[in-house]
Amino acid sequence: MKLLGRKKSYGQDIETSDDNVGSEASLPDTLSRGSSTTAPKGRPTRKRDDADRRHTKKGPITPAPMTASEARARRKSLAPPKCHRAERRAKRAASKAQITDRRERMMAGEEAYLPPRDQGPVRRYIRDLVDARRNALGLFTPSALVLLFITFGVPQLQLYMSPAMLVLLSVMGIDGIILGRKISKLVDVKFPSNTESHWRLGLYAAGRASQMRRLRVPRPQVEHGSSVG
């Protein structure tokens, strides 16, 4: 008995479904698994560098110490050999002598031992010009100390300390400007090929002039009033 509107029989439907199941079973496993299989990268796997292999320790790992005494013994075995007291003293003495020698050479003005800001013939010439001149800038430290002691010793003079300090600073500023201009002109005459700015040369000269003579580094190589060519 046929139903209205039905073109295929029930038996034909069963056969069609069996054929579909058979065709799906005949597909390869790679297609049936779908996205579970990753496609090849197209390039070889990157290997570790030789340096990593050299630094990688091979072999069994040493177990951790179980007690504090084992930990102390392991640290003692891994520690470098200790130097005797006489060897340590000799090393300290040699290091101290080397530092002293380098400082003496720097204070003497040897070019190889000077800091970068003091190296060069231009800087040496500026130092000689400043050291041969009596500068008002060098009076800042002793004058400040004297004014400080007077302030604490005689409180009644505190009203006069501020104006005195302002006058001292003004004199120092004027002296620094005069010194910087003079140094720049003399450097241009002696070193025509100098490319360093006048501002930096003036600051270098003023900074050295503001220090006390015995505290200058390197120590002065000329006397007061000497002629510097």
From Swiss-Prot:
Any single GO CC term annotated in Swiss-Prot or TrEMBL for this entry: plasma membrane
Source taxon at top rank: Bacteria
TM ranges: 137-157, 159-179
Keywords: Cell membrane, Membrane, Transmembrane, Transmembrane helix
Main location: membrane
Pfam families in UniProt: DUF3043
Residue spans of biased composition, Basic residues class: 73-94
Membrane topology of the entry: Multi-pass membrane protein
UniProt-annotated stretches for the region Disordered: 1-102
Xref: InterPro entries: DUF3043
Subcellular compartments: Cell membrane
Name of the protein: Uncharacterized protein ML0869
Species in which this protein is naturally found: Mycobacterium leprae (strain TN)
Lineage of the organism: Bacteria, Bacillati, Actinomycetota, Actinomycetes, Mycobacteriales
